Structures are given as structure tokens and as C-alpha cells.
Swiss-Prot record:
Protein name: Glutamate--cysteine ligase catalytic subunit
Gene Ontology biological process terms from the UniProt entry: blood vessel diameter maintenance; cell redox homeostasis; cellular response to fibroblast growth factor stimulus; cellular response to follicle-stimulating hormone stimulus; cellular response to glucose stimulus; cellular response to hepatocyte growth factor stimulus; cellular response to insulin stimulus; cellular response to mechanical stimulus
Signal peptide stretch: none
GO cellular component: cytosol; glutamate-cysteine ligase complex; mitochondrion
Regulation: Feedback inhibition by glutathione.
Keyword tRNA-binding carried by entry: no
Length: 637
């Protein structure tokens, strides 16, 4: 989760005093990198995935499942057995926000050959097996986007009660500080977001109104004025960073051949973010309730919203410099490529001094405004030992701001003094239950980048429409019921990367005629006379490629999953979870998820993930039935 510096963290007041210093030197560090590597070309399109996991413990006797606060210990063992022993170990493990979470990636990035698509699932299985092998009896490693009873009494093992005091990190009524990773970055981020904002974060998620759900649904917080003011009727109220950053996701990073190719990919994939997010929807439950949303994006956005009342437009500007329209965790605000420029229709708040400085240093308008927009934010964590740096050889101040702008896409300059290329990160996906599904989504997105570059595809629409799509994508059953703005003619371009833009730029078409509302089924599978469909385009690309039979078979299985999720033939994880709870014998149609219902659900998820049972409505028949890891968690029931 971004920059992990070691040392003594500063309080918000101390960090604030150094904010201008961090910004000033962050820009100098960016300029050093830019001038050193702006002409760097890479032959190979490298890429890699990141999967976040939760550690859970099953109490089969009492029918409870809890999150195990042993992430640091598990991580230490995994690193000791893996990368520290063998630098070429096939897996890498990193800490995540929750002390019940870990993050796993392949040990080395994947390369540009088609056959590497066939190794993704095997590597994910290796990760799952590796981490599972060191867990205790009745514990499991789960890829679940949001734990349904996160923040409910007794959701952790060992059980810890929240202690909502000012001196703590989150001051939460529900989420104890002990559930935050012990690395000082995480608790400092939590505390400093709250202190900068001037109050606790506020998350209100609409509750799903079932037959017996109280109407209006109102929770009372008599002990806490802040919660009483912040909570809304008919909403599930949450008050801590952990409710967002304590969820799991699936991300992919690509290394492009050049900076211009990275900018082109960044823009094209930005339009795809809401579509893939809706397709990967996996988080319908929050704080023990059934919600009316299927994706975590808005929850995580609110959970790290450090904007003051002035910046949110609730009070006149006095102590702050800007009105800021979005949280630090949200969708992108500007396209970076020349062909994206005419679709930049969102008002962009920028630091004008930084923007002018970047222009004077030879940075073009689009990249300058992107960086100047990121740098309207304050640093949230700072370590005493890391204030004065060598700007020519270090990038911590740049990364400090860059890595706490959590957007749908991230444009990543190479680290200083490395041979890494310019990269982009695709960040909107929800993690799926199985390695098969996670591989399918990763391979789909990576293949899409290959096709975008090979066929010079153009998905660009006005950025405000992408934002509207992001809102639709989070709604319940968006994959089947949502309509999304999408470009009609995506095959217009000339040599998009070299020319900096496709021919569409020169056309006299009105932007409004270039796009229309489509269903996800139409976007993914196509509709005669309306849109060719992304999967048919990927299939035609595959037909023209040299691909061995085994790899082709794997890829087709992955694409079949995406195709059927888009058409509704298969359920999203979110839809499947809703049906599971709705059909549970204990469910009273009141939107409440009890301990026992949660236990049944997570146990089933774990059985599916370890291929101990089939789930055709979620996975279809393409799911390969290969037994690959002994489970420590199966109950005798």
C-alpha cells in the first residue's frame, strides 16, 4: 500500500509544518526522474498483479468466523522462508492496512509472451498454498473484498473492543486500533487523516430495504455526538479508515514501452475502470448489514477523505487554499495523452506555482496539470529521519504525495537509479473468491492492453461521463441493470502512440455523437449494429497470434467467465453472496447478517476457493477442478 518508510512518525501538526518542504522537494525529485528517463524505451511489456488476502479463523462449535490479527507474524514467516532465502522466489509478500491482511504478488513481473498468461493462476495458487501452509488449525486465507461483519462486536481474534478516545488512531466506535497493521505508517495515516479533516471520517452506505427492514432504518449512538450528527437514516454508518482500507482488492501494474505509451494506456484504461469494477462487484455487506451497493469504491473513498469542511465547500475558505471536489481516493480527474485532451471536461484544481514550475522545466501542459493536481494535497505521514533527502537519488517526498492519491488509475514514473520503465496501475477491481476468477480478470485486463496497443483502439469519452459511470458501477446489480456511457466507434485511430493521437482528434464529429449509453453485456459481448464487443475483439486478436493450445484453452476459459458474468448467465460474487444470505435459514429478511450466517457464508467461500465444492452459478463449467491445497478449516458438519 504505497510507500513504507521506517522511522519515527511525526504528528499531524509537525507534518503540516513540513508540508511545503515535502511538496517542493517532491517536485524536484519528480523533475530529476523525468529528465533522466523521459526518453527511456523498453522492448518488453512487463506486468504483474497484486492480490490482497484476509486471515480468518473458524469456530465450528459456536459457528463464528473472525478476522485473525496475525498478519505481521504470517508476513514475517513468509518473507523469511521466501524472498530473504531466495531472491528469485516465485512469490513476494507485503503488509497491508489491516493486521488481518497480507498482500501477495508474483516474485518477478510477467513478460510479453502469450504463454505467460498460463502461469498467472498457477502463481496465485502457489501464493494461496504457501500462506495457508503456515496458518494454525481452523484458519484460512480468504480473498474476500469486504468481511461482512467488519466492525461488529467480537469480529477479531483475539477479541478486542474499540476504545474511541482522542489519543487513539481512528477513535472509532466499531473498529479497534489493534486491527490496524502495526507498521507506524498505517496508524499514523489513520490519525493524521482524522486530525487534518478536523473530525472522524464519515461513511454512510444505503441499507438494502428488505421485507422486514425497519423503515426508516435508524441507529442511535447516544454516547457519541459526532456519530449522532454524522449518521443518516436508512444508511449503515461507519467511522474509520479501516472500513475502507480494511477491504481487499485486485490490482494490475503494466510497464509500457515509453512514457507516451504509458500515458495512452492510462487514458484508455480509465474509461474501462467502471466497467470492470461492476463486473468484479464483490462487496454487498457492511458492518453486519446487507447494503444497497455491490462495490467498495465509495466506502474506501469516504474512509480516507481528509478534506476539511472548507475544502468540502461547507464553510468559506479561510485556512485552506482550495475547494476540492473529491476525496484523495477517487476516480482520475484528467487524461494525460494528447488524444485525451479534448475530453478533459472536469474542473481541475491545481497548484498554480507548481504547474508554472513544471512548464518552465519543459514538462507539457497535460502532465504538468496532472502533477500539479496531485500536489494540492498535503503529505499525510512523514518520518523524522526522512525529512532531508538527496533529491537527485531519492523519491520519497514525491512518492509521499503520489502514493496517497489513490485513484482508479495511477501513472508511475520509474524509481530513481533503476532500469524500470514508465508504468500504469489499474486499481478499481474487487478481489474474487478463487484464483481462477482473479486470474480471469487479470488476464482480461492485460489482454485488453495488448489489443488497445495493437489495434490502436480509442475508448475515450468526456471524463465527466466516466465519473457518472463510476457512480452507476457501484449500485446493486449494476452489471445487469446499469447503463454506461461508452464510445461507439473505437477503431478510428491512426498510429495513436507515435502520433500522440488517433485521427478522431481531427474529425469534426461532436463529442456527444461519439458515445452512447450501453449495457455491460453490449460493451463486453457486443450487439449487432451497436457495438462489436470487447470479447469478440479479444478473440479476433487471439486468432492472429501464435498461442500454444494449452494457453489458448486457459485464456478462452477466462474470457468465458467474463462473457457470462456480463450476460448474466453467471452471477457476480456480490449477487451470489446476496442470494446465499437471502436463502439462509436464519435470515429474517431484515437486512441483518448474524454471526452464524456470516460463518456459513465465509465457510462456503473458503470451500469454493479450495475447490472442496462446486459453484456453477458463480464459476460455470469452465472452472478447472484441480485439487491443489489441503484445507485446514473444513468443519465436520
Amino acid at each position: 500500500m504505497g510507500l513504507l518508510s521506517q522511522g519515527s512518525p511525526l504528528s499531524w501538526e509537525e507534518t503540516k509544518r513540513h508540508a511545503d518542504h515535502v511538496r517542493r522537494h517532491g517536485i524536484l525529485q519528480f523533475l530529476h526522474i523525468y529528465h533522466a528517463v523521459k526518453d527511456r524505451h523498453k522492448d518488453v511489456l512487463k506486468w504483474g498483479d497484486e492480490v490482497e488476502y484476509m486471515l480468518v479463523s473458524f469456530d465450528h462449535e459456536n459457528k463464528k468466523v473472525r478476522l485473525v490479527l496475525s498478519g505481521e507474524k504470517v508476513l514475517e514467516t513468509l518473507q523469511e522462508k521466501g524472498e530473504r532465502t531466495n531472491p528469485n522466489h516465485p512469490t513476494l509478500w507485503r503488509p497491508e492496512y489491516g493486521s488481518y491482511m497480507i498482500e501477495g504478488t508474483p516474485g518477478q513481473p510477467y513478460g510479453g509472451t502469450m504463454s505467460e498468461f498460463n502461469t498467472v493462476e498457477a502463481n496465485m495458487r502457489k501464493r494461496r498454498k504457501e500462506a495457508t501452509s503456515i496458518l494454525e488449525e481452523n484458519q484460512a486465507l480468504c480473498t474476500i473484498t469486504s468481511f461482512p461483519r467488519l466492525g461488529c462486536p467480537g469480529f477479531t481474534l483475539p477479541e478486542v473492543k474499540p476504545n474511541p478516545v482522542e489519543g487513539g488512531a481512528s477513535k472509532s466506535l466499531f473498529f479497534p486500533d489493534e486491527a490496524i497493521n502495526k507498521h507506524p505508517r498505517f496508524s499514523t495515516l489513520t490519525r493524521n487523516i482524522r486530525h487534518r479533516r478536523g473530525e472522524k471520517v464519515v461513511i454512510n452506505v444505503p441499507i438494502f430495504k428488505d421485507k422486514n427492514t425497519p423503515s426508516p432504518f435508524i441507529e442511535t449512538f447516544t454516547e457519541d455526538d459526532e456519530a449522532s450528527r454524522a449518521s443518516k437514516p436508512d444508511h449503515i454508518y461507519m467511522d474509520a479508515m479501516g472500513f475502507g482500507m480494511g477491504n481487499c482488492c485486485l490490482q494490475v501494474t503494466f510497464q509500457a514501452c515509453s512514457i507516451s505509451e504509458a500515458r495512452y494506456l492510462y487514458d484508455q484504461l480509465a474509461t474501462i475502470c467502471p466497467i470492470v469494477m461492476a463486473l468484479s462487484a464483490a462487496s454487498p455487506f457492511y458492518r453486519g448489514y446487507v447494503s444497497d451497493i455491490d462495490c467498495r469504491w465509495g466506502v474506501i473513498s469516504a474512509s480516507v477523505d481528509d478534506r476539511t469542511r472548507e475544502e468540502r465547500g461547507l464553510e468559506p475558505l479561510k485556512n485552506n487554499n482550495y475547494r476540492i471536489s473529491k476525496s484523495r481516493y477517487d476516480s482520475i480527474d484528467s487524461y494525460l495523452s494528447k488524444c485525451g485532451e479534448k475530453y478533459n471536461d472536469i474542473d481541475l484544481t491545481i497548484d498554480k506555482e507548481i504547474y508554472e514550475q513544471l512548464l518552465q522545466e519543459g514538462i507539457d501542459h497535460l502532465l504538468a496539470q496532472h502533477v500539479a493536481h496531485l500536489f494540492i494535497r498535503d503529505p499525510l505521514t512523514l518520518f523524522e529521519e526522512k525529512i532531508h533527502l538527496d533529491d537527485a537519488n531519492e523519491s520519497d517526498h514525491f512518492e509521499n504525495i503520489q502514493s496517497t492519491n489513490w485513484q482508479t488509475m495511477r501513472f508511475k514514473p520509474p524509481p530513481p537509479n533503476s532500469d524500470i520503465g514508465w508504468r500504469v496501475e489499474f486499481r478499481p477491481m474487487e478481489v474474487q473468491l478463487t484464483d481462477f476468477e482473479n486470474s480471469a480478470y487479470v488476464v482480461f485486463v492485460v489482454l485488453l492492453t495488448r489489443v488497445i496497443l495493437s489495434y490502436k483502439l480509442d475508448f475515450l469519452i468526456p471524463l465527466s461521463k466516466v465519473d457518472e459511470n463510476m457512480k452507476v458501477a457501484q449500485k446493486r446489480d449494476a452489471v445487469l441493470q446499469g447503463m454506461f456511457y461508452f464510445r461507439k466507434d473505437i477503431c478510428k485511430g491512426g498510429n495513436a502512440v507515435v502520433d500522440g493521437c488517433g485521427k478522431a482528434q481531427n474529425s469534426t464529429e461532436l463529442a456527444a455523437e461519439e458515445y452512447t449509453l450501453m449495457s455491460i453485456d453490449t460493451i463486453i459481448n457486443g450487439k449487432e449494429g451497436v457495438f462489436p464487443g470487447l470479447i469478440p475483439i479479444l478473440n479476433s486478436y487471439l486468432e492472429n497470434m501464435e498461442v500454444d493450445v494449452d494457453t489458448r484453452c486457459s485464456i478462452l476459459n477466462y474470457l468465458k467467465l467474463i462473457k457470462k458474468r456480463a450476460s448474466g448467465e453467471l452471477m457476480t460474487v456480490a449477487r451470489w453472496m446476496r442470494e446465499f444470505i437471502a436463502n439462509h435459514p436464519d435470515y429474517k429478511q431484515d437486512s441483518v447478517i448474524t454471526d452464524e450466517m456470516n460463518y456459513s457464508l465465509i465457510l462456503k467461500c473458503n470451500q469454493i476457493a479450495n475447490e472442496l465444492c462446486e459453484c456453477p452459478e458463480l464459476l460455470g463449467s469452465a472452472f478447472r477442478k484441480v485439487k491443489y491445497s489441503g484445507s485446514k478449516t473444513d468443519s465436520s458438519n
